[in-house]
Amino acid sequence: MAKYEVNVERTNIEETRELLKIKKMNDFQNIGDLIPAGGSFVFNCERYAVLAIHQEINTSGDQDYRRLIVIDPDGNTYGTSSESAIDTFTELIMDLESYNIPLPQEMNAFKRKGKDTKGEGYILIGLE
C-alpha cells in the first residue's frame, strides 16, 4: 500500500480542526490557472499553510513536494505546488512578520519566464 504523509512546514492557523482539514485539502483553486496571460491574480491572504508532502508511489518511486494553501477572508481557498511561488510567498510572510505587519494582506501572483522554463514560466508572489 502506498504511503501518503503530510507535515506542516509553516502556518498561521492555530485551530487544530482547521489545520487538520487543510492537511487533507485537495479542493482548491489552482493559483497558476487563475493568472491571466501577461497579468496577475490578486488575492487577499488571511490564513495560510505550507505543507511538506511525501507520497510513496509504487510504480515511479517516492515523490516529495510542497503545497501552499491560502485562505481569503471569504473562505475561498487557493493553492499551488510551484516551488518558486512557495519560496517567494514564504519570504514575503517572513518580511511581514519581521515588520509586525498583520494579515490579511492583498497579494498578487504572476508568472515570469526563465532561462530553464519551457512554456508557463515561474510563478512568483508579491504584495499588491
Q: How would you describe each model-predicted region?
A:
Residues 1-75, 126-128:
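OB-fold ssDNA-binding interfaces and closely related basic DNA-contact patches used
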Residues 16-17, 89, 93, 124:
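Generic N-terminal initiation segments characterized by hydrophobic and/or small/turn-forming residues
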Residues 29, 42-44, 90, 100, ...:
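Compositionally biased, low-structure terminal segments
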Residues 40, 70, 81-84, 114:
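Alpha-helical protein-protein interaction elements
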Residues 67, 106, 121:
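Beta-strand-rich binding-surface signature
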Residues 78-91:
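GIY-YIG-like beta-to-alpha core
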Residues 88-108:
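Short nucleic-acid-contacting surface segments enriched for D/E, G, S/T with interspersed K/R
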Residues 110-128:
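OB-fold/S1-family single-stranded nucleic acid-binding modules
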